[in-house]
Amino acid sequence: VVIILATVIAWLIGSLVTGAGPSWSGLLLVFLFVGLGVIGLLDDGIKIMRQRSLGLHPSGKIIGQVAVASLFALGTLIMPNEFGEYAGTLEISFARPTALTLGFAGLGVGVVLYLIWTNLIVTAWSNATNLTDGLDGLAAGVSIFVFGAYTFITYFQRIQACTQLGANQSTCYSTRDPLDLAIFCAALIGALAGFLWWNASPAQIFMGDTGALAL
């Protein structure tokens, strides 16, 4: 819970101070982050109340993750900004956009494939992080490096944005709200660093499913 609260508060302050948001992309990310955290909180709460290691039934946990991930995915395909950019896209890219798209057989098929792909990523990553949280400081330490990379990537996209004055259109990046995403990732790193101080072996506080599923 402390990781989620610290991250959201720091992101909100950072977004307001810099004028980067709160943006639609940032709000979607917070929704996904908090939504998965709530599922983990329910799981932890059941374990505590029933004094046993079994919390939510696995199928119930997956259903919750699919519901949150699906709403998140649909949210990325609506609400374009003033440049016509969406938080998500059906196009498949590597370092640059390619001619490949999930909508190869029509928009309806593309959206369905996009939902499946998003759910696969969210449920796989969320549960993998939960499994990683088996040693003191492991999940938090690994996540710091992961979100450190995301901070660098999103900030680089911000300074190389196609909407920047004088941007080279052949080398720029057309992504939505990269600065707000960088602020969120940086806020999460700060929250994890503070948490890691008390979670390193021998741990005095624990992440639980609340923090692990959110990450």
Protein language model features and the residues they cover:
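Membrane-interfacial loop-to-helix junctions in multi-pass inner-membrane proteins
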Residues: G19-V30, M49-G64
